[in-house]
Amino acid sequence: MFDKRHRITLLFNANKAYDRQVVEGVGEYLQASQSEWDIFIEEDFRARIDNIKEWLGDGVIADYDDDDIAQLLADVDVPIVGVGGSYHLAENYPAVHYIATDNHALVESAFLHLKEKGVNRFAFYGLPDSSRKHWAAEREYAFRQLVAEEKYRGVVYQGLETAPENWQHAQNRLADWLQTLPPQTGIIAVTDARARHVLQACEHLHIPVPEKLCVIGIDNEELTRYLSRVALSSVAQGARQMGYQAAKLLHRLLAREEMPLQRILVPPVRVIARRSTDYRSLTDPAVIQAMHFIRNHACKGIKVEQVLDAVGISRSNLERRFKEEVGETIHALIHAEKLEKARSLLISTTLAINEISQMCGYPSLQYFYSVFKKEYVTTPKEYRDQHSEALL
């Protein structure tokens, strides 16, 4: 007995990374189940809702974080599975079957990551209430709950919505807030986009990240890997799994299976740790300044002498302070920084290995292979094949 062929509408703005991954998850279920579905989604991946009720087909999977979509589907008589953020109050969920990203778990993952790094001061950069982003309010609520439970003092700044006409003003206000935070504060941003705003403001203020402030975002948005000088740590949402679960649930509904209203929470995939939370508990201002200089210039072929010139103290003095604070020599830190930059580029980009070798200041590809294999007991190519973030 063959399943009836169904026409299914996907209502997502899949030009955004999160929505796109949800749609990919739907596709993965179709491939795995071999369901006979004809999928309708706008050609430019925008969720247009004009005359929506005339072309919904046999079932819908929709972005219920979008209030306009949720309202228009309120009295539609076809099976619907909503996808969106979780709520801490059960009564706030929409009255449809619902697959939710676990907002509390997302923030908790970021919080625990910072704690594991030795951070004990925390701040949250969210979105203003005027943005009408329920998931942002839920993440802020989760942050407040977590710091209260752990007896930490948490600072929250919602900031301003950003648009071209107010961008500089919003960044100036963000900079004002950042300057009120004590050193060694870990900032959890509500999204990677907001985290990138923090990194940009820190660069303009000459606040070293992660030496003085740590920053972690949520989404693991691929574009942010390239748009900020400091590589951003982030919590990867289970968006593909959400799409898969939504399609699986819709399949059951199309088969007229009787079931109570479903609420399925999908946890985050994992924390992707990058430079922005590579925190060491440093207290010596000269060492902090030197570490920041090394991180920004190691791949330009700097020697110990350039670090000394940047900090302005003698070699014996700085070497002694490095040994006390870091347990390494200045030269060893320059070497380690170059290698870490190369490792990061291997797993986060598709750049040719020879180009990475040149970018990181190695005199030849052969020498880079030798140094890399000595540290990681594998070749750069083998390491990329095993650890590439493109697999996420």
Residue ranges and their predicted role:
Residues 297-302, 329-330, 379:
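Short helix/strand-capping hinge loops at secondary-structure junctions
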Residues 305, 331, 354, 370, ...:
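Residues within the helices of the helix-turn-helix
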Residues 312, 328-332, 363:
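Recognition helix of helix-turn-helix DNA-binding domains
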Residues 209-210, 315, 330, 353, ...:
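Alpha-helix N-cap/start motif
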Residues 322-329, 371-383:
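A secondary-structure capping/hinge motif
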Residues 1-59, 69-310, 319, 324, ...:
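Bacterial carbohydrate/catabolite-sensing allosteric modules
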